[in-house]
Structures are given as structure tokens and as C-alpha cells.
UniProtKB/Swiss-Prot annotation:
Record function comment: Peptidoglycan polymerase that catalyzes glycan chain elongation from lipid-linked precursors.
EC number: 2.4.99.28
Residue ranges crossing the lipid bilayer per the database entry: 19-39
Keywords (A to Z) from UniProt: Cell inner membrane, Cell membrane, Cell shape, Cell wall biogenesis/degradation, Glycosyltransferase, Membrane, Peptidoglycan synthesis, Transferase, Transmembrane, Transmembrane helix
Record's keyword annotation contains Membrane: yes
Family of this protein: Belongs to the glycosyltransferase 51 family.
Pfam families: Transgly
InterPro entries referenced in this protein's UniProt entry, alphabetically: Glyco_trans_51, Lysozyme-like_dom_sf, PBP_transglycosylase, Pep_trsgly
Protein name as catalogued: Biosynthetic peptidoglycan transglycosylase
Subcellular location(s) of the protein: Cell inner membrane
Gene name of the record: mtgA
Membrane disposition: Single-pass membrane protein
Signal peptide start-end: none
Amino acid sequence: MTFRFSARCRLIKRFLLRLLLACAVLWGGGVALFSIVPVPFSAVMLERQLGAWLSGNFHYIAHSDWVGMDEISPWMGLAVIAAEDQKFPEHWGFDVPAIEKALAHNERNENRIRGASTLSQQTAKNLFLWDGRSWLRKGLEAGLTVGIETVWSKKRILTVYLNIAEFGEGTFGVEAASQRYFHKPASRLTAAEAALLAAVLPNPIRFRADAPSGYIRSRQAWILRQMRQLGGEGFMRANQLH
């Protein structure tokens, strides 16, 4: 009995190691490939689509249209940086002071969890991983973040982020969002429109750009102020992000 149990444990360990190796090869290949190739779909898009089908919702379609940075208004990149990660051009994938503040806040407020994910971390998660707060997913996210920060430029990270971010039910990427909410291409987004889209990013299922609540309007105004304080379009040029 003991021998059989030990043999079974060895088989499980071997299987898990092979699975981990296969995932590492797959993710490493993805990091290298998507440094130059447009992203056709993300893990979050796949998760949303499969979830809809499994729940019997066959009308749901995860929609995205890839566009290059030269086809995206500079206001949009500036808006998500102002809203989500103002140290994006400076850090190496992680904002350590923000993480420390979030940990301290979460210890005091267990019912109001605050995140500190950078745009790089969000890109890694959205592109390759699943939703959740497990330590396993966080560990994989950290490794993938280091990978994309090593291989990709900051401009590339921002481009991919803007193309796979979720802006509403079935709406992924800034081009699809711009067409849905403003009926025009992402290249023509104004500062106010970009700030409105960025305002829903913390929870694009709960918050809506086409029916913004008072909270979203106040968040939009805050983002616009932050965009001005960062330096407007000049910030994007100075940091070679557009």
C-alpha cells in the first residue's frame, strides 16, 4: 500500500512538473511572439466567452479590433496612465511603494481590498491568466510581468494593454470601445472621452461608459486633472509612448 501511494505521488509530481514546464514554454513563446505580432485574443476574453456559453448565453460575443499605437489617440494612453499607473514610464513592472500602501490598507480594511497592480501586471494577467486573487496566480503574474518588461518596450506594453482591456460587456480594446460608445475610431478620441473610458476600468462590468454614474463622472474629472498635471500630450512624447 505504501509503495503504491509513493508511486502515485511520484506520477503526480512528474505530471505537475511537465505541466508547469509546458506552461512556461507556452507563456515564454507568447511573450516573445506578442512583442511583434498583434494579439488576436486574451485569456480574459476566452474566459468571458466560455463562461457565457457555459451559462447558456449564446448571444455574448467577446469583440476586439486590434489597432497600433499610431491609430490610438494619445489622450487614451495618457488617461489610463493617469488613472491606473502614473509611474508607468519609471518602474520595472512593479510599484513597490504602492504595493506597501495597499498591503497596509488591506490589513486595516479587510472588507475594502485595494489593489496596486501596474499596467504591466494588468497586461500580463489579462493576456495570459485568469481572474482571482490566489497566491499561485499572483506568483505567475509576477513572473510574466518580469518577462514582458524584459522583452517588450513600454510603448508595446501600453499598446497591448489598450487593445485587450475590458471596457464593457463583450467590449475589449479601445477601438471596439470607441466605436461602441462614441461611434468613431480610437484615433479621434478626445481627452474627455478617453478619461471616461479610463474611469470604468476598475470594474467595466459594474460601471458603464454609456450610462455613467455620478461616481464615474467625478472619477472622469479627477483623471482629466491628473492628465493635465502629468503634462498632457507632451508626457507621451517625452516618454516615447506614442
